[in-house]
């Protein structure tokens, strides 16, 4: 039997993989099918006004919800009585794994071998102007942290990947902080880049995941993070920080690996 079909009329279940996509399907179809809607994160604005009204309009057609973090499940329970299914992120150990020879990797990607390398692999800039920081991802926080680190650590290098990195790059250049930028890379390369790092930092204000947390965990990449998304499910409490105590955060690679490998 087919697991998925292109024609929703032939489906037993309709999966709204992102909340806004519900408007792309006919109400007639949604009424006649079992509908599951994935909610990856909720922001403060989602609990009132036009955003809550939009949620209520969509909820008429939703039978149950899917979330990837317990934090989102708890938030969602405040605005719905419908069933919420928690299925956490998964991670493929054939793609993401530890590589011991970090010196060779740094040489391969022209990363200074003697540097303390800090990674950030997610977009940081709004798409409408390619200048403004995407504040939900916390790039302003990232810059504050690496600026302080740069004053205390010799030979700091920031390693960036992904599109829409204009804000962070501009700020790094203002501060004269060394960086290496590899825009779009495949999984093999990204795994090698994780393995080139001394530290990965998640500075987001709100997240569904991010996937980088489990990818760091299973590759044994040292990571610290704000308390967003799945952070508290994967990372040791000492690896989770706020902007008042970030310099005290300590990576625990064994703890993160143990929790991430369960998702393989």
Indicate residue ranges for each PLM-predicted region:
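Acidic anion/phosphate-binding donor-loop and adjacent secondary structure
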Residues: 45-49, 78, 91-108, 114
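Donor nucleotide-sugar binding/catalytic pocket of nucleotide-sugar-dependent glycosyltransferases
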Residues: 63-75, 81-100, 121-122
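Conserved catalytic-core segment of nucleotide-activated headgroup transferases in glycan assembly
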Residues: 106-108, 113-167
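Nucleotide-activated donor-binding/catalytic signature segment of Leloir-type glycosyltransferases, i.e.
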Residues: 162, 167-188
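Short alpha-helical donor nucleotide-sugar binding micro-motif in glycosyltransferases
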Residues: 192-197
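Aromatic "clamp/platform" in nucleotide-sugar-dependent glycosyltransferases that forms part
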Residues: 205
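Short hydrophobic beta-strand element within catalytic cores of glycosyltransferases
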Residues: 222-225
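Conserved acidic donor-binding segment of nucleotide-sugar-dependent glycosyltransferases
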Residues: 238-247, 255-257
């Amino acid at each position: 039997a087919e697991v998925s079909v292109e024609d929703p009329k032939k489906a037993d279940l309709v999966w709204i993989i992102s909340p806004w996509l519900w408007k792309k399907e006919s109400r007639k179809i949604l009424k006649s099918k079992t509908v599951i809607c994935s909610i990856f994160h909720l922001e403060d604005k989602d609990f009132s006004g036009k955003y809550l009204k939009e949620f209520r309009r969509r909820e008429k057609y939703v039978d149950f919800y899917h979330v990837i973090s317990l934090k989102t499940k708890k938030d969602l329970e405040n605005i719905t009585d419908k069933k919420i299914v928690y299925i956490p992120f998964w991670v493929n150990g054939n793609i993401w794994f530890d590589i011991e020879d970090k010196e060779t990797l740094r040489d391969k990607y022209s990363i200074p071998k003697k540097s303390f390398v800090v990674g950030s692999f997610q977009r940081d800039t709004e798409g409408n102007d390619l200048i403004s920081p995407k504040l939900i991802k916390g790039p302003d926080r990232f810059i504050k942290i690496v600026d302080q680190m740069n004053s205390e650590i010799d030979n700091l290098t920031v390693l960036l990947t992904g599109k829409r990195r204009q804000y962070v790059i501009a700020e790094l250049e203002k501060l004269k902080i060394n960086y290496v930028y590899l825009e779009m890379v495949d999984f093999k390369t990204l795994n090698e880049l994780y393995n080139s790092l001394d530290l990965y930092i998640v500075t987001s204000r709100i997240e569904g995941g991010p996937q980088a947390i489990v990818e760091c965990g299973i590759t044994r990449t040292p990571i610290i993070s704000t308390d967003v998304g799945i952070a508290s499910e994967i990372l040791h409490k000492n690896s989770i920080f706020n902007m008042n105590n970030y310099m005290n955060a300590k990576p625990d690679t064994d703890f993160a690996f143990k929790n991430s490998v369960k998702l393989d």
